[in-house]
């Protein structure tokens, strides 16, 4: 999941994930959690909140790089007896952006297993479709339709890319971000970085970089014959961090 940089509320909070979740929900928390834990392999998750309700969730395995999103991610997190959580606050505008960028991670319903848990959570901790729509509408953000998403994927496969409802960033900040991303690509990929750099240079805003990050990822992973996969994954993780901190 890609989420705008938030303000630190608390770092290194330890405990049962369910208890931490209940505590934050009761305070009407708006922001996100970064959750670190080991279940089979080291994993890191992000959970997005709006007014004490869960909006979206996603997990990324550190070694295998596999991802789980939405209800499946929340189901795994609810079973954690021990984890380390960093808490970050966001304003609703940034929550709306994160929601737009992570549509596939939206939590629509509580996991089915939750109803079997004594004293389990209720659907009241999940945002309803109307609540999510209200957040987006307030900030003038339009979620792409399924047809538009399909078109984006087709364009990406064709080598082109149409950006939907992209907004702009401050030119100076954006140029600095682009330069950092290009330097990162050149550091990890050397002379093979051209395909990745071309996509970065073609972007006109930080938001467009987010929209086209799958294209950057595809360009990088096409080099796996020449560059170790681990090195490519490390570069992409660093780029995600740079973009997240700038928006």
Swiss-Prot record:
Pfam families hit by this protein: DUF2226
Superkingdom of the organism of origin: Archaea
InterPro entries linked: DUF2226
Protein name: Uncharacterized protein AF_1501
Organism placement in taxonomy: Archaea, Methanobacteriati, Methanobacteriota, Archaeoglobi, Archaeoglobales
């Amino acid at each position: 999941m890609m989420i705008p940089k938030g303000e630190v509320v608390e770092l290194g909070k330890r405990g049962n994930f369910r208890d931490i979740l209940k505590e934050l929900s009761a305070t009407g928390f708006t922001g996100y959690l970064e959750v670190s834990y080991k279940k089979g392999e080291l994993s890191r998750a992000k959970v997005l909140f709006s007014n004490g309700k869960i909006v979206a969730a996603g997990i990324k395995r550190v070694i295998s790089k596999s991802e789980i999103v939405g209800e499946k991610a929340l189901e795994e997190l609810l079973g954690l007896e021990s984890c380390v959580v960093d808490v970050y606050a966001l304003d609703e505008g940034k929550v709306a952006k994160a929601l737009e960028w992570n549509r596939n991670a939206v939590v629509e319903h509580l996991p089915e297993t939750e109803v079997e848990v004594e004293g389990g959570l209720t659907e009241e901790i999940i945002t309803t479709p109307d609540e999510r729509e209200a957040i987006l509408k307030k900030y003038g953000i339009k979620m792409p339709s399924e047809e538009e998403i399909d078109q984006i994927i087709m364009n990406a496969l064709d080598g082109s890319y149409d950006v939907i409802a992209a907004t702009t960033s401050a030119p100076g900040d954006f140029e600095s971000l682009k330069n950092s991303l290009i330097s990162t690509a050149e550091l990890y990929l050397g002379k093979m970085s051209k395909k990745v750099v071309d996509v970065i240079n073609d972007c006109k805003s930080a938001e467009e970089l987010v929209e086209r990050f799958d294209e950057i990822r595809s360009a990088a992973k096409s080099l796996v014959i020449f560059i170790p996969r681990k090195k490519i994954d490390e570069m992409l993780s660093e780029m995600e961090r740079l973009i997240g901190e700038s928006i």
